[in-house]
């Protein structure tokens, strides 16, 4: 029966995942957010903050996004990939929110390895401390193309204003990064 339902939906171009997203959004309470995680393989057990790469935008953490399509774009080329819907309750959690600005650019540059020569500089140390003094982060997504622009800024090829204008034009959406066990405990897969 389920196979025939899916076959009918496919034939009629019904976007089942979009319907599922709408139903999940209807069930959200205050302080709850619907987030999406694209995984290259199935998640077994609880969310593990140590599984992610250390050279992601904000270091190790559990990376999620605001849209199904966004999560899909990160894992669509992998055979065993999955998209997870998450119910995230942000009440009583400390958030660090970033905008497209110099602080955001330099924090990403640090975690992606472009500021290794300056890792002991007080400004970089302050950025690192601020990025870890929270339970979760909300920040603009920086894909590899955006990172090339950030690197051009770090290398002195662009001013910070030129860099911000280039990056603001890409607008890939916002990412939510869970960075503490408290945030994980308030997230339901």
State what each model feature region is.
Residues 2-57:
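ADP-ribose/NAD+-binding catalytic cleft of ART/PARP-like enzymes
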Residues 8, 74, 149, 153:
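Residues that form generic nucleotide/phosphate-binding pockets
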Residues 40-42, 68, 182:
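A broadly conserved detector of short glycine/acidic/proline-rich loop/turn motifs that flank catalytic sites
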Residues 60-63, 137-139:
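Short cationic amphipathic helices and targeting signals
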Residues 17-19, 30-33, 49-60, 66-128:
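ADP-ribosyltransferase catalytic core
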Residues 87-189:
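Active-site and NAD+-binding cores of ADP-ribose-processing enzymes
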């Amino acid at each position: 029966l389920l196979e025939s339902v899916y076959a009918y939906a496919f034939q009629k171009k019904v976007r089942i995942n979009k319907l599922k997203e709408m139903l999940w959004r209807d069930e959200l309470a205050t302080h709850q957010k619907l987030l999406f995680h694209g995984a290259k393989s199935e998640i077994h057990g609880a969310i593990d903050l140590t599984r992610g790469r250390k050279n992601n935008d904000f270091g190790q953490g559990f990376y999620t996004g605001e849209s199904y399509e966004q999560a899909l774009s990160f894992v669509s080329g992998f055979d065993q990939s999955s998209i997870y819907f998450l119910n995230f309750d942000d009440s009583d959690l400390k958030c660090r929110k970033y905008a497209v600005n110099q602080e955001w650019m330099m924090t990403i540059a640090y975690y992606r390895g472009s500021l290794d020569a300056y890792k002991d500089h007080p400004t970089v140390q302050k950025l690192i401390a601020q990025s870890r003094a929270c339970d979760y982060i909300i920040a603009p997504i920086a894909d590899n193309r955006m990172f090339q622009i950030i690197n051009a800024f770090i290398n002195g090829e662009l001013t910070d204003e030129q860099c911000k204008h280039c990056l603001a034009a890409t607008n890939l959406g916002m990412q939510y990064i869970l960075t503490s066990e408290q945030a994980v405990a308030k997230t339901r897969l």
